[in-house]
Amino acid sequence: MEIDSATNGNSDTVMTESAATITPSPVVVSSSRSNQFTESLKLEHQLLRVPFEHYKKTIRTNHRSFEKEVSTIVNGVGELADSDWSKDDTVSRLTCLVTRLQGLKRKLEEGSNVENLQAQRCRARIDHLDSVDVENITEWNNTKLKRILVDYMLRMSYFETATKLSESSNIMDLVDIDIFREAKKVIDALKNREVASALTWCADNKTRLKKSKSKFEFQLRLQEFIELVRVDTAESYKKAIQYARKHLASWGTTHMKELQHVLATLAFKSTTECSKYKVLFELRQWDVLVDQFKQEFCKLYGMTMEPLLNIYLQAGLSALKTPYGLEEGCTKEDPLSQENFRKLALPLPFSKQHHSKLVCYISKELMDTENPPQVLPNGYVYSTKALKEMAEKNGGKITCPRTGLVCNYTELVKAYIS
């Protein structure tokens, strides 16, 4: 790490470590392919979970559609067999059933194609993880980095940029653009105070949401009820009561207290000053629904709430965070000199360093017993190698790059690291 000036500025003083920038130790790549694969799986849960969940959803949707159509057609054939219709009516109805069968065949083919594409995506991701090896670790990590960047872009709604990067890098099967587009439509609708898209999403994922004991749909229904009450007309109150009977009554067995709280708004106006009910009419409730949807969406697909880029950056910053990195005098080489990195590192503990690692401000090389630190008269510290090279080029003169102080090489004092 770099050393700032000593507090008293004397040449015989051993320097402080206040201007520290920690140099991370090099990562040692294990030669065991199985160990690498196992460790990768721990970090790549959502890479496999997302397409697999989408694949299961498509299969269930196609199966339900198939059963519904077949049931209708079989019932139609049964009615024809038991009826005494004329020949023309029978032929006409049979023609309609044949048309429905042809339509069913087309839907099955389309559904099969979609299933095959999603199965291909699952296989591509398994193959990607299985390809981890010492020989291609650099290329594999490069692909992983692009996946992480695409994940960040998608979460920030940069869909066009994410698509272009994915296509140019040939990683379309390794990213989830369509899933995030689906989520973006729901989020935009909620921001526009519309719940239809969110309710459709809940219906499409009803089984899984019920299994996870989600109450997101209940919250959406409550918000629709509140919006009807907000209108504050006799007709809107009537609609609100009808809506509650149709869509909220079934939630009473599990969420009675919340339901009673919201239903009590029938006795209040949206302009009420009663804090208990005023909060229900606040527009920020829509922001709460957006946040709740994001949580349910990530939970459904096994995604992290934070972008993967943030998580990996925090993992690195946890090894670099020092008290000096948060000071104004922090050198620009320290990542924590950047405000965005400081925000990411804020909840992280300081790095525990048992031994100091000093990095020369001039050469950026490590200072150790082979290249010991030297203290200038002004208290600033640099490596012996860098100072020797400077002295050779300037007739034995040393110029401090941070203060401009000029001194002779003979005035330097060797520092010792404890």
Swiss-Prot record:
**Keyword annotations from UniProtKB, A to Z:** Cytoplasm, Metal-binding, Zinc, Zinc-finger
MF terms (GO), sorted A to Z: ubiquitin protein ligase activity; zinc ion binding
Subunit architecture = Interacts with RANBPM.
Q: Name all CTLH domain ranges.
A: 179-236
What SMART domains does UniProt report for this protein, alphabetically?
Answer: CRA (SM00757), CTLH (SM00668)
Q: Which InterPro entries match?
A: CRA_dom, CTLH/CRA, CTLH_C, Fyv10_fam, LisH, ZF_RING_GID, Znf-RING_euk, Znf_RING/FYVE/PHD
Q: What is this protein called?
A: Protein MAEA homolog
Where, subcellularly, is it found?
A: Cytoplasm
What's an example GO cellular component term for this entry?
A: cytoplasm
Task: Please give a single GO biological process term from the UniProt record.
Answer: proteasome-mediated ubiquitin-dependent protein catabolic process
Q: What are the start-end ranges of the zinc fingers (RING-Gid-type)?
A: 330-403
The chain positions of domain LisH read 141-173
